[in-house]
């Protein structure tokens, strides 16, 4: 990391050369290269250039991290709450001191806009403050004794080593979701960021090393599934496995973890419905849908994947929605006036375009879209796209798009709408826009999702976030995240 006095100069140089150097793993309190010496070039989807050389973990590195995390847990769990909170406050201050480096790392590895990168960085700062305070608010319980001969106390103890396998779309926000509650509760953790966006997570490991955070409590590495996530899942050391990613990958993790009984926390794929009724606040509905749909280039698990619009307001909604979508400026987030960056890589863009082509071949009407002209080679930009006349037989209706494509379905009445809202394999987020309290009450119960947002959107570290069906188990954020890593133990 840069000395604080040199930080601004270092950031300026990095912006010019777009090179974050060799990023080492963080295992057992020290920065280290892979036992096998393997490195991987990390290509920015925004520039097409190599921005870092990443030390990639071997199976031996993963085994070492597991052993070090166990040692870290044995030390960390024995510290007092105040001692742990002092260390976490020191870590939070160090993150704030290096906020600019983290910010640019997220921008370059994802191509995010400045505002979108803010979501990542602000979340880790907030989480490292929220969870130590949440631990101070936690209370043990005295349970009644039927015979009157004992005093029964229910206390909360840390489970042990946590292994966290993370998605690429919010590289530091996802770290925040997992690290903050784990270390606040007295657990140690191994962070396995996605190989597609690992730079900022490795930089977080450097920050931990800089302040000499207790060895083994936080560990950061990534690599192939066979060398990292599978050994972690199959190991007998972890007591908690937690993941953010696709439903298909989550199912594999569940199967791999069966070598022992582990606590699982899974935040998986979504297929969020948004219901726009004829009595809605049109400004609020349009602005929220455009903001949600194209934020982070549509690569958000809670983004509205199916937007249902009542026929009596359809034309007005589409006119205003299209006008706002046309105004989105696509490019690299560091450039002035940019509203949306690229998708994560060319492979992801090809999949999105396959879903678009499938919909058009089955009768959908496509407007806008296409690959922007004049972008550098090896970049993965895609213009915002709108699909109308979408029907349930199209892949985009049933699969998570995870890209800047709005799929619109017109409906006449609630009787027409209701059979299309719920799907058998997903239930993460949903949105309802109406001024009818009766409708709000109906759909908050009818929609089979972990979250129902009404007339707007609100997410935060203090609000529980989780799904049902194949969209996951348990919750990130809020005090409920602690239930994953705590054992409630009667004494």
Outline where the language-model segments fall:
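N-terminal Rossmann-like NAD(P)+-binding subdomain of aldehyde/semialdehyde dehydrogenases
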Residues: 15-150
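ALDH superfamily catalytic-core signature
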Residues: 240, 248-391, 454
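Conserved C-terminal structural/oligomerization subdomain of aldehyde/semialdehyde dehydrogenase
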Residues: 47-53, 238, 275, 329, ...
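Short, well-ordered beta-strand elements within core beta-sheets of diverse protein domains
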Residues: 51-57, 72-78, 164, 274-277, ...
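Structural signal for hydrophobic packing residues in well-ordered secondary-structure cores
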Residues: 73, 77, 92-99, 103, ...
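Short loop-to-beta-strand entry elements in the cores of soluble alpha/beta enzymes
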Residues: 87, 177-180, 185-196, 200, ...
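Rossmann-like NAD(P) dinucleotide-binding subdomain of oxidoreductase/dehydrogenase enzymes
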Residues: 140-284, 411
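Single conserved hydrophobic/aromatic residue that forms the stacking wall/gate
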Residues: 1-14, 486-490
